[in-house]
């Protein structure tokens, strides 16, 4: 298997270098969120009211490095989150009828590239947490549980608009921006975007509210392979191999601890 070691420098989600948050022409409602495991772990826990959620760096995508980064004897990998360079003018991919059948019932929202341009990290985590009932169902009274229930009957575009107006989700995002923000925001000059990958009935599904119009089936979990291994293979083939050795990618694993977490 081809070995890939990732460069996991701290990055932020900036889908447009003309963002008001960078130009000083007024502060956008959603500010850039750091991609550190600490920040995203805090985000997942706050959205779900569950301390067992954690986010890990993934340092490489071959089996040995995956096993070092995510010990699935003590936790279960629910999703991989990819941070990758975004491209201006990239078209939105339309999902096929077959994909719609295979992903029926999955929760998906569209990301407005204007108002929600810097919310892609939070959207990726929300997408992951809302679609991993097989790992751990959302608590109905949690911030995200209530938001998903309230918007379940809406279209993906309507859900995106509702997220923009949701104080329950935005307040968590804003608090973590303040806690995590440093000189990174000022020094960041490369646009990046987040997408998440989850399993649905043996399929690896990509959830990207900016560049897909619905859940996209991008791979299969073959017999004898784990979701973690299958999703890592998809990321390698779809994103890293075509990039010809570019290093500005980050992969993180969203995991759920088997045992309760006790914090002092």
Predicted regions and their residues:
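Intrinsically disordered, low-complexity terminal segments enriched in Ser/Thr
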Residues: 1-14
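Cysteine-dependent deubiquitinase/ubiquitin-like isopeptidase catalytic cores across multiple families
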Residues: 18-264
């Amino acid at each position: 298997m081809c070995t890939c070691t990732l460069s996991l420098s701290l990055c932020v989600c900036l889908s447009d270098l003309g963002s008001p948050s960078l130009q000083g022409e007024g502060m956008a409602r959603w500010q850039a969120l750091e991609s550190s495991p600490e920040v995203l772990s805090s985000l997942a826990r706050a959205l779900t009211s569950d301390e067992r959620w954690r986010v890990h760096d993934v340092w490489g995508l071959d089996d040995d490095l995956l096993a070092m980064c995510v010990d699935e004897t003590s936790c279960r990998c629910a999703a991989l989150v990819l941070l990758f360079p975004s491209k201006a003018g990239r078209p939105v991919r339309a999902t096929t009828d077959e994909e719609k059948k295979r992903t029926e019932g999955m929760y998906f929202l569209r990301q407005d590239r204007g108002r929600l341009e810097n919310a892609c990290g939070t959207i990726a985590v929300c997408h992951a947490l809302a679609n991993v009932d097989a790992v751990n169902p959302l608590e109905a009274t949690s911030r995200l549980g209530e938001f998903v229930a309230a918007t379940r009957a809406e279209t993906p575009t309507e859900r995106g608009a509702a997220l923009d107006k949701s104080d329950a989700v935005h307040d968590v995002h804003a608090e973590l921006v303040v806690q995590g923000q440093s000189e990174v925001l000022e020094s960041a000059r490369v646009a990046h975007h987040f997408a998440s990958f989850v399993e649905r009935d043996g399929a690896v599904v990509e959830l990207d509210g900016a560049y897909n119009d619905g859940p996209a089936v991008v791979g299969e979990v073959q017999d004898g392979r784990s979701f973690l291994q299958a999703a890592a293979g998809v990321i390698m083939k779809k994103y890293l191999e075509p990039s010809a050795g570019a290093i500005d990618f980050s992969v993180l694993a969203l995991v759920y601890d088997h045992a309760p977490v006790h914090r002092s």
